[in-house]
Amino acid sequence: MEPIVKQENPVTTSTLSTWKPAARNKTIPPPESVIELSSSNEGSELGENLDEIAEIQSVDRTGGDDVSGTKRARSDSIASPAKRLAVMIPDDDEEFLLSTTSGQAILALPATPCNVVAAPSSWGSCKQFWKAGDYEGTSGGDWEVSAGGFDHVRVHPKFLHSNATSHKWSLGAFAELLDNALDEVRSGATFVNVDMIQNRKDGSKMILIEDNGGGMNPEKMRHCMSLGYSAKSKLADTIGQYGNGFKTSTMRLGADVIVFSRCLGKDGKSSTQSIGLLSYTFLKSTGKEDIVVPMLDYERRDSEWCPITRSSVSDWEKNVETVVQWSPYATEEELLCQFNLMKKHGTRIIIYNLWEDDEGMLELDFDTDPHDIQLRGVNRDDKNIVMASQFPNSRHYLTYKHSLRSYASILYLKISHEFRIILRGKDVEHHNIVNDMMQTEKITYRPKEAADVSQLSAVVTIGFVKDAKHHVDVQGFNVYHKNRLIKPFWRIWNAAGSDGRGVIGVLEANFVEPAHDKQGFERTTVLSRLEARLLHMQKDYWRSKCHKIGYAKRQGRKSAKDTEKDTEDRESSPEFDPKGSASSRKRTVPSSFKTPTAAPRFNTPTAASEKFNPRSNVNGGGKGSVKVSKDIGYKSSEKGGKLGNSFSKSNKRAKPQGARAVEVTNSDDDYDCDSSPERNVTELPGKSSELPKPQSGPRTLSQLEQENNELRERLDKKEEVFLLLQKDLRRERELRKTLEAEVETLKNKLKEMDKEQASLIDVFAEDRDRRDKEEENLRIKLEEASNTIQKLIDGKARGR
């Protein structure tokens, strides 16, 4: 027999007139087969008081033989829809079926207890997020023992606040909610709308996040409100994986959140709509010692929405009272009106009681831009805002820290054209940072542990920002993970001067794990190697192309792969990991340990001028790695002579520099390298691995003198480079002074022009006044002449 699926009729849908809440002050006697929900003498008093929050008591599993294993049955004699729905409580936590009067079967879940403390603690007037966790709850109460004699560990309401502190940045909380909406694309979502609305109760501002995705049925709604549950971790191409984002993000933006969700029926089930309230204000004000979430569920029957009661009608009424009292809506009818604003499916999240800063103003700024949500405080830099208007290609770098519109435009590497992100009535235009770059290069990076090349690899697009010729201090890598921006403009190279300016990059690294707040990555060896590799890329790119954007060409400098200063620059990074970056340091082998026939020939002046790095004693894996003593001295195992002592006596200045060295770098491109952390032996070409005996005599002295001369020449070259840098610095300072002088001159000229303009205005005014007076005199003379002529004409006429 085909199952009967009831279709929703959008024309006759009504959420207000078809069902009315039962009377709050009326006690309904339960049927004989239903267990009375009571474990306290105060139950009747709490049920009669409308101002107090009622409690859904748990069933006493140890109080009588006839109670254990008994299921609550439905009474078909109850007339109203609310009374007609009684629930059976199973022995375990699995899903169970509610049989309706028509014989249909409804899938439901056990009710979540809503424990209430009669003596509420003071909430206080603290509306600052970082101080909201400082409150004293009530002392410990009776601990319930669940089935099997195991204790049920409570989750204190303070955990909601401490859990939300993982978001140091409020816009990161918005990103979590946008991730949830984007994941609904697989369920048919075409938009997510973020807006600011007014609270009708007190006129305060609230945040609205809504989408037209698949919605949540009662079971998914309870999973959403739970901690740590995530079905997305098993799905491909989804961002969420920890089951913690909704709670941390909403509690970071405001103290309370209410969720409305409507879901279409599947597999013969009816459509459902649910309301869930996660209120930190409610939990603190009532002195809760456990997190409880009032929820209301409704089921579509023909053209009517009927409530789904999970324990009893009185418990349903208590949940309704709790939601109405602590939500922004005054009645249950106003709550149900929110479902009229969505279509057949979707979710509306409303965050209210938004957090304030130390000055008593909202952390979020809704007034500066009517189509944006911005941050106040340290994340907002007025200088960057002015620069963003001057340098449009660097706008996202300068504004993403305080502007949600700017941050949301670069939040995803790729986004479907059919999906819209609407922020306060205006679409957010997706932006690819690559479009802001010039002279781009693409480099494929594969980590050492790469097993699947298609998944564990990253294509790094690196280039100059188009405003780099203005020497704007913009640099960093935008690192994405599964299409989501995790590290915006990650600054890796912290050079002392202007090195690295203007170099930006984009990559998607799916082989590193993001942190829980998705604003960084877990510190692992893989991340350290990626960081070191990106540092090499940026240095190579900068030193080969910096002259194209107006900087002096770095002559005589080595590339990032060969320079001995890589380690020092790497250590200057704020996220430096000595263990993780050890493999990227260089190893050197003094040429005095090699026979003349095995000595390498240097093909370039740069390679020939490499100096010995005294810190090269690093035990790292990789091809060609060598373990060498930190001191140049080497004790011969055959004669016991000290080469280091004779070397230091011959030339003390040459000791720290050492002899000519061969440098071998370890990069992640060497896939066939040994994975062991240390190798003590290096095979030299054409020779055995045994070290030769140290030489002595005039030949050794002449060799040392020759090497000393070479060291002096290299030192002179370094001094030339240093002088060149000093020259660049002086030129920059002179340029700055010149610009400052020009600015001052322009200011003086502007003042003079203002004075000249004022004097010209005065002259013109005087001329106008003088001209007016002359015109007046001429007018008077003209009138007198006219009168004289008229008199003469009249006299002549009379004489005739």
Curated annotation (Swiss-Prot):
Q: What's the protein here called?
A: Protein MICRORCHIDIA 4
Q: What is its EC number?
A: 3.6.-.-
Q: Where is the composition biased (Acidic residues)?
A: 666-675
The Swiss-Prot or TrEMBL record describes its family as follows: Belongs to the MORC ATPase protein family.
Q: A Gene Ontology MF term for this entry? A: ATP binding
> How does this polypeptide assemble, per the annotation?
Homodimer and heterodimer. Component of an RNA-directed DNA methylation (RdDM) complex. Forms homomeric complexes.
List where the motif Nuclear localization signal 2 lies: 735-742
